[in-house]
């Protein structure tokens, strides 16, 4: 018999879905007492090499308020050629093309193994992909040269029919005309004045590309539509390569003590307007490269005086950041415009100081774009990360989807509260929309402009079935996820995932519900909720909310005697959850101390879009130990794991750190690894490096690589992440294990757990 752990794993691999609860409480009242809501982490484009797309369109329920897709949960009458919708119970006739179906000849969408299935839409034109480069020229020559080389490299990776455009900016904004032979021609705009899409259309003489009337059947291959500013790669490859090579640093002089005048806000506005006027609702990426903060015009984040530092968290808390609100408002308006027309905005920011990601974060967050942060464009971190944007699948197609929409349909007993992730609401009200909103709610449809195989949304549900209307024994609730998107091949595709879970009466079957708890998924779903709240609430308030939820969960599902904390026990399905919450409280997602606003925005951006595995690594980093006593092994993320004769490899998602213990570091300095008789030591030093390289080669964005040792300045990255079970206060305690004491006043996991148990038991007594 399959265990819940295996069931959860199989569902994630097949459907890209992880639920907080895999048996659902059958009434609204009982569901609210579960503390953690019924919710799911859903990866719309989960990679399935064994799932070839089907070359026909889905069969829909005929009821206009439903329109659910035929799926394995539907009841089928093969004789009468009828099927009953499992969401609204409407009986539907199969289309004539299904005349030959029978119990022995079922279409793929009725087979249980195809609970997720992808259809190819054969009608409508196939549009080319569009890439619009928006390049900051206010940077050092070395950085600009490296960026130019990376962009030239990317041109060679684009399909020949892809349309490309180029906008450069500094004090002025230049829109380059790429259709000119022999000369470089561009339109120059002032960087201090914003332009509406209509004004831009008139100034550039733009017109929308007409979309041909939708027709059924295979499309006749036509040359891709284009204009002077967006041209096919195959036509202007050489010209654009030369143009990029000739790009110079912004010519306007920068007086001493001043920052260069950088018009990022206007440049992005023109990019959004250009695509808005020419290719609305077509897959397009605006790829913006910035080397510093916007210092003039709409969207500016700091003045040009170098003596005035860019805002910090302290300034924002004291309401002393004069440009934040206005700058954020400008970029939010641009993000919403881009999301409406289905265009993606990527931001690649490389500088030693902040560049304004706090104000600009809504652009990638709302459009499903990438956010990359680094020190310089001339580092392997940026170069390899940018190259991975253009990763291709086994069929030679980019691993990216464009202009996606997600629609969710539910059984009558459950409704949708909202979604948290890289999406915007399409304001589609329906019978399955809950009045209680969580995240982006009040809708059953969302726009996801940019999708990758790991893009993951958190979807929150509300059980609405009343306590006095019991669900029959064996009843199941169903949810259908319908994702429509433009594939990188130009095809429109529809991926449909339909899942079902059992209902249970929480008064008589609480053990069944408890056994179905997915603590990993629940931790990520609650973390997303906490980070979403942290954007608008005070940090301490969010931590208090998180603590209250944890205490309530422990009281509901823990086993203990009144007023006896030592008796507290958690079943195996809940045992790791408090540990996840402990590390989440200490994480840079909720603790802004020692991080700039840009860094916090960057960390939160990635957490809100990554899948479960990567999100767990972000909350609780993985620690591996290498020593002579045995093969590499995972060890506790604890200060007791830091030993003199060990090498540690820590993966935090954003950093890959190799730490050499005191003895190992001394041997390395003495050069033992270079002596033939100490070859085993050389192998020991090399083992974590090889494992680190494996992670570095596969992750997006590429993590920062840190090689440090006992007493090294960068060892602080490890010391700040481990549980401080040994500190300067207890390092000489009797029976204390050996390890590295951490100089901190933070509480350890043990103290945290002791306090949690005590609080649960005492509060229980007070309630009794």
Swiss-Prot record:
Chain sites annotated for binding Zn(2+): 61, 66, 85, 88
Gelsolin-like repeats by residue range: 632-718
Keywords: Acetylation, Cytoplasm, Cytoplasmic vesicle, Endoplasmic reticulum, ER-Golgi transport, Membrane, Metal-binding, Phosphoprotein, Protein transport, Transport, Zinc
UniProt topology in membrane: Peripheral membrane protein
Chief location category: membrane
GO cellular component, one term: endoplasmic reticulum membrane
Domain of life: Eukaryota
SUPFAM superfamilies registered for this protein in UniProt: beta-sandwich domain of Sec23/24, C-terminal, gelsolin-like domain of Sec23/24, Helical domain of Sec23/24, vWA-like, Zn-finger domain of Sec23/24
N-acetylthreonine found at: 2
One of the protein's GO biological processes: COPII-coated vesicle cargo loading
Cross-referenced Gene3D superfamilies: beta-sandwich domain of Sec23/24, Sec23/Sec24 helical domain, Severin, von Willebrand factor, type A domain, Zn-finger domain of Sec23/24
Modified residues (Phosphothreonine): 308
Subunit structure: COPII is composed of at least five proteins: the Sec23/24 complex, the Sec13/31 complex and Sar1. Interacts with SEC23IP. Interacts with HTR4. Interacts with SEC16A. Interacts with SLC6A4. Interacts (as part of the Sec23/24 complex) with SEC22B; recruits SEC22B into COPII-coated vesicles and allows the transport of this cargo from the endoplasmic reticulum to the Golgi. Interacts (via Gelsolin-like repeat) with MIA2 and MIA3; specifically involved in the transport of large cargos like the collagen COL7A1. Interacts with DDHD1. Interacts with TMEM39A.
Domain notes: The Gelsolin-like repeat mediates interaction with proteins containing PPP motifs that include MIA2, MIA3 but also SEC31A. These interactions are probably competitive.
Role noted for this protein: Component of the coat protein complex II (COPII) which promotes the formation of transport vesicles from the endoplasmic reticulum (ER). The coat has two main functions, the physical deformation of the endoplasmic reticulum membrane into vesicles and the selection of cargo molecules for their transport to the Golgi complex. Required for the translocation of insulin-induced glucose transporter SLC2A4/GLUT4 to the cell membrane.
Family: Belongs to the SEC23/SEC24 family. SEC23 subfamily.
Protein name: Protein transport protein Sec23A
Upper lineage: Eukaryota, Metazoa, Chordata, Craniata, Vertebrata
